[in-house]
């Protein structure tokens, strides 16, 4: 079964979407923040305010297929033009999971790389959840991505199995 956005339209391979919490009142969309000693925002977080949609993420998979379904390994990346100057020199900002902290960060890349992604979108209740599959292994090893609040009150996106962030997808560029 294909994945649908908030309008009920099919998620498109290579489309840009705001990733928003399915439940209102629990923060806004996914964006970037500086955490720890980062001089540039590299950590994927949930916006504090539910009125903030966050940054559009391009969701894609290398096979040239138009429609995304729950079985595909996916890449999520933010576009440099939407970001602070320290990130604008990069052509692409794909998500990755830091091994030790299990946090989702961006890995700035000078040029496009067609790597098979490590993430999947899975149906969850009436919405979706994001999961991380280490080393593109079988579904059994995929773990939920959820929110962990740090000492600076950042709502970090982390591998948090059993406590997923329920999400929905809103087109970043609505026509009409």
Curated annotation (Swiss-Prot):
The gene is ACTI. Residues 137 form a propeptide. The keyword Disulfide bond applies. Gene3D superfamilies: 2.80.10.50. SMART domains: STI. This is Trypsin inhibitor. GO terms for molecular function: serine-type endopeptidase inhibitor activity. It comes from Acacia confusa. Keywords: Disulfide bond, Protease inhibitor, Serine protease inhibitor. Coiled coil: none annotated.
């Amino acid at each position: 079964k294909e994945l649908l956005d908030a309008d009920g339209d099919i998620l498109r391979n290579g489309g840009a979407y705001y990733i928003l919490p399915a439940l209102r009142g629990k923060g806004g969309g996914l964006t970037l923040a500086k955490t720890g000693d980062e001089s540039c925002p590299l950590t994927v977080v949930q916006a504090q305010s539910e009125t903030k949609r966050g940054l559009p993420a391009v969701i894609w998979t290398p096979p040239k297929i138009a429609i995304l379904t729950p079985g595909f390994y996916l890449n999520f990346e933010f576009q440099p033009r939407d970001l602070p100057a320290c990130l604008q020199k990069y052509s692409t900002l794909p998500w990755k999971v830091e091994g030790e902290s299990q946090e989702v960060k961006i890995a700035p890349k000078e040029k496009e790389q067609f790597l098979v992604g490590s993430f999947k979108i899975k149906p969850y209740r009436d919405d979706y959840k994001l999961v991380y599959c280490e080393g593109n292994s079988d579904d059994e090893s995929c773990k939920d991505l959820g929110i962990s609040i740090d000492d600076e009150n950042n709502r970090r996106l982390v591998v948090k199995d059993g406590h997923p962030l329920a999400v929905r997808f809103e087109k970043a560029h609505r026509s009409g």
